[in-house]
A protein has these predicted regions:
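Basic, nucleic-acid-interacting segments
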Residues: 1-304, 315, 319-321
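A generic alpha-helix surface/boundary motif
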Residues: 307-308
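Histone-fold and other basic nucleic-acid-binding segments
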Residues: 311, 315, 322-332
Length: 332
């Protein structure tokens, strides 16, 4: 019996701003540990956040490029949890009024893995988006045998979270989605989206269910994948693991697992939290954002997108759609 796979992706993208989301500290990859910090991004008592308008503008532009709707008002919320890389013990994020709603990411054929080109079943389709919201990044933890160190240079970096609908049906489609999304972000000069540098990170939600069952299966979240290829490998393993559990009469529990690329397997981290566990509430230190002026400012900056450039190449030069898509994959 073939099980049905359902996949949704949460992609976190560091924006190419010069300063952090709520303070003036510079955003600089590779700086000396804890060099770019201040009382605000260290969460010291009495320090107040100040919005980075550039990060808001970039997020609205991303929404325009991806066909999202931007509501007239967006607000900020506190996501409450305790972890060493979050100095305030809450993260400033967005809950019920994000900057962007809806939208889609097109699946270009050339974005699929080369060894899966012949198996593309949904050519020209798009993956729906639930929302795009803006938040602050957390610090970077480095784990070693002697202990864990934390670098707060990354804490407070503007982080755009792009949440897909559960529309993805295979690891290969997830691979294509991430490549296509990365291409669009680079076109808009919103981010370098280098996964090895942590500028683009992906959490995967995956479930399986038997044919004929309408209700989605138990959702398992996967973390710790530092490349698009690793996402594909992790999904292949996890789908096989879940199917094996169900076929053997076992029960899946909603949880979070980490991918170990060296061992080629996922490992249990914790049972999964729900949104109510974070006790979101509006941030009292930040005013809501009215977006009308920002939308009008960013509208002229929407670039020609990859699929639009590819269509122009086909019309102007008479080349094949595949060749045009390959040529348009590079911004230059």
């Amino acid at each position: 019996m073939e099980y049905i796979t359902t996949i949704g992706l949460e992609v976190h993208v560091q924006l190419k701003t010069q300063s952090k989301m709520f303070c003036a500290c510079p955003v600089e990859y590779g700086a000396q540990p804890n060099a770019n910090t201040c009382p605000t991004c260290l969460g010291l008592p009495g320090a107040l956040p100040v919005l980075n308008r550039g990060a808001i503008e970039y997020t609205v532009l991303a929404g325009m490029m991806l066909g999202c709707e931007t509501p007239p008002v967006s607000k900020w919320d506190r996501k409450n949890y305790f972890y060493p890389d979050m100095p305030k013990n809450y993260q400033i994020s967005q809950f019920d009024l994000p900057l962007c709603m809806g939208g889609h990411v097109p699946l270009y054929d050339h974005c699929y893995p080369k060894d899966a080109q012949k198996d593309i079943t949904r050519s020209g389709q798009s993956i729906g988006l639930t929302r795009i919201h803006l938040e602050e990044d957390v610090a970077k933890s480095t784990h070693a045998a002697a202990g864990t160190t934390i670098d707060f240079n990354r804490a407070g970096t503007p982080l755009m979270e792009i949440v897909s609908e559960p529309d993805i049906e295979s690891p290969e489609e997830a691979f294509a989605y991430l490549n296509s999304l990365r291409q669009i972000l680079i076109y808009g000069e919103l981010s370098d989206a280098d996964m090895e540098k942590g500028q683009m990170r992906c959490d995967v939600n995956v479930s399986v269910r038997p044919p004929g069952q309408e209700e989605l299966g138990v959702k398992i979240e996967l973390k710790n994948m530092n490349s698009v290829s690793a996402v594909r490998r992790a999904l292949h393993y996890e789908i096989e693991r879940q199917v094996a559990v169900l076929k053997n009469g076992g029960e899946l529990i909603q949880s979070t697992r980490r991918w170990d690329d060296d061992l080629g397997e996922t490992q249990q981290m914790r049972t999964k939290e729900d949104a109510h566990d974070y006790r979101y509430f509006p941030d009292p230190d930040l005013l809501p954002v009215r977006t009308a002026e920002i939308i009008e400012k960013m509208r002229p900056r929407v670039p020609e997108l990859p699929h639009q450039k590819a269509a122009r190449f086909v019309e102007d030069f008479g080349i094949s759609e595949y060749d045009a898509s390959v040529l348009s994959s590079d911004l230059d």
